[in-house]
Amino acid sequence: MTGNGADAMKKSRSIRKDNLAGYAFISPFIIGFLCFTVIPMGASLFLSFTSYDLFTAPKWIGLDNFKEMFTGDEKYWQSLKVTFTYVLAGVPLRLGFALFIAVILNNAAKGTAIYRTLFYLPSIIGGSVAVAIMWRNIFGNDGVINALLFFVGIDQKILWYQNPTSALWTLILLSVWQFGSSMLIFLAGLKNIPSSYLEAASVDGANRVQRFFKITLPILTPIIFFNLVMQTISAFMTFTPAYIISKGEGGPLDGTLLYSLYLFQRAFNYFQMGYASAMAWVMLVIVGLITLILFKTSSYWVHYESKEE
């Protein structure tokens, strides 16, 4: 009995040491998660029910921030309208262009690695301040786009940033340019499609277009779904291009006033931290609901290969 008891104690000590080692290894993540995610989110939730300007103590006002947001702030609804337009137009265009380039690269005989790297670069630098400034100059009154239009015979300069509609579309085009990450994922999916499927369809008389829509596209639907969710979330968080192109104002006539930009204005231009926190939580709910809808509707169009196959 004594020997068994000693063995049990040794085993218990060994387990405790293993547990301590495990906790030590994951402690940096836990500390970082608490300090940079949980605590800031909790503070933001509290501040959303207060009036807070960074210089005085937060004052509890209940739901007043949310009431003002939904009933008395026309700019808020404009920012929602601009953001949803940006997402609904930009995400499908970006995914469509990414899939188009991926199909071309998948069929390329040589140089795939080089082109893959070149096409991915915009995703790395596309959201940077430097690229946004470059984009603003390209579409400026004396920029490259107007110079090309003059070269083909269009003498009238287009004031891209003086019109709310065209200004927003320049932002959308900039977002489409950042297609590289989705393209790489699509390309990986295309490489994994069994060639036997396409060969069998070809033997049955299916042409290239039919093979794409009847075989390739259905097999890619899980990847399309993944890219759709990720790009939708990313689009709702877009800030830098709108800030640089509109010089932080969201103009003209609030035509480029994305939600994140308006949140920034409320927080750091007007120091309404409580209101900005409320906006952040509303956006979290909106993105969460849209993501939930995408997951719920995915069963109607996303096709997964069964485990038996």
Curated annotation (Swiss-Prot):
Residue ranges of domain ABC transmembrane type-1 in the record: 80-294
GO biological process: transmembrane transport
SUPFAM superfamilies, alphabetized: MetI-like (SSF161098)
TM annotation in the entry: 29-49, 84-104, 114-134, 167-187, 217-237, 275-295
One GO CC annotation: plasma membrane
Entry function: Part of a binding-protein-dependent transport system. Probably responsible for the translocation of the substrate across the membrane.
Coiled coil: none
Membership in a protein family: Belongs to the binding-protein-dependent transport system permease family. MalFG subfamily.
Superkingdom classification of source: Bacteria
Name of the protein described by the UniProt record: Probable ABC transporter permease protein YesP
Cited InterPro entries: ABC_transporter_permease, MetI-like, MetI-like_sf
Membrane topology of this protein: Multi-pass membrane protein
Key word Transport present: yes
Record carries keyword Nucleus: no
Subcellular location(s) of the protein: Cell membrane
Keyword annotations from UniProtKB, A to Z: Cell membrane, Membrane, Transmembrane, Transmembrane helix, Transport
